[in-house]
Amino acid sequence: MKHLIIFLLFPFLGAAQPIISCTDVIKPYADFESPLAFEETVVALQKELNSRGITIFATIDHQKAAEAVGESMQPATVLIVGNPKVGTALMQENPRFAIELPLKILIYEEEKTVNIRYEKIAAIA
């Protein structure tokens, strides 16, 4: 009988817990507004990353991919980036880091504003 009461009350106990946004806990991001146009932002960011010795492993143009299947969307590009020397050291210390690397940077346009978003390193450390 005791187990039946606990089982019946369990859904209500969960409702008493504070609501926490998953995005705050799981994926805290840094967001910035770019003063440049979309393409200028992508090029400037690529140049800056290269000047700092950061490898750009891939550039994914989501708008172009959408157009390839007959769809349209706002400009959005993801840069897959990293520094193999730093990444290797992190993965040697903790192999689970491999799921988070390489890092991703999103450049997107929303309501005529160009934004840059990336995951804070502290969130995965």
Task: List PLM regions with ranges.
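Terminal, regulation- and interaction-focused segments at domain boundaries
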Residues: 17-56
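Beta-strand/loop substructures that line and gate deep hydrophobic ligand-binding cavities in soluble
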Residues: 104-125
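Hydrophobic alpha-helical segments with strong N-terminal bias
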Residues: 4-5, 30, 86
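Sec-dependent N-terminal signal peptides
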Residues: 3-13
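A broad, low-specificity signal marking well-ordered, structured residues that form hydrophobic/aromatic
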Residues: 14, 30, 77, 105, ...
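Compact, glycine-rich, soluble single-domain proteins
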Residues: 46, 50-103, 107
